[in-house]
From Swiss-Prot:
The keyword Secreted applies. Keywords: Developmental protein, Secreted, Signal, Synapse. GO terms for cellular component: AMPA glutamate receptor complex; extracellular space; synapse. Pfam families: VWC2L_1st, VWC2L_2nd. Its main location: secreted. Residues 1-21 form the signal peptide. This is von Willebrand factor C domain-containing protein 2-like. GO terms for biological process: negative regulation of BMP signaling pathway.
Length: 138
């Protein structure tokens, strides 16, 4: 038993000697912060507070400039304290609206139907009808 442990110890001591310095990359072992050479030293990130606004994609807007942040269709204005976005009171969508467009700041109803269509036949609202189900056996 002691012989197996001794062989394992020798094996562990021999393996590090087999690894060449070329096999070890500097990326494998990060250096201390003081030893690291940053490739981003030449990048300057400006502070835009009081000078403009930055959107999610990093685009910079001037003070007073109107823009649409992110996926919003509602406009914002770049102010000293950051973007000022007014959310208007949008009209309610009609309950029978079947086609809604989201092109502007508020959703708009483009089509209202007073009937229900099922398999090419029109029915009145709240009109009951039977659905025939045909079962196919193969």
């Amino acid at each position: 038993m002691a012989l197996h442990i001794h062989e394992a110890c020798i094996l562990l001591l021999v393996i590090p000697g087999l690894v060449t310095s070329a096999a070890i990359s500097h990326e494998d072992y990060p250096a201390d912060e003081g030893d690291q050479i940053s490739s981003n030293d030449n990048l300057i990130f400006d502070d835009y507070r009081g000078k403009g606004c930055v959107d999610d994609s990093g685009f910079v807007y001037k003070l007073g400039e109107r823009f649409f942040p992110g996926h919003s269709n509602c406009p914002c204005v770049c102010a000293l304290d950051g973007p000022v976005c007014d959310q208007p009171e949008c009209p309610k969508i009609h309950p029978k609206c079947t086609k809604v467009e989201h092109n502007g700041c508020c959703p708009e109803c483009k089509e209202v139907k007073n009937f229900c269509e099922y398999h090419g036949k029109n029915y009145k609202i709240l009109e009951e009808f039977k659905v025939c189900v045909t079962l196919h056996t193969y």
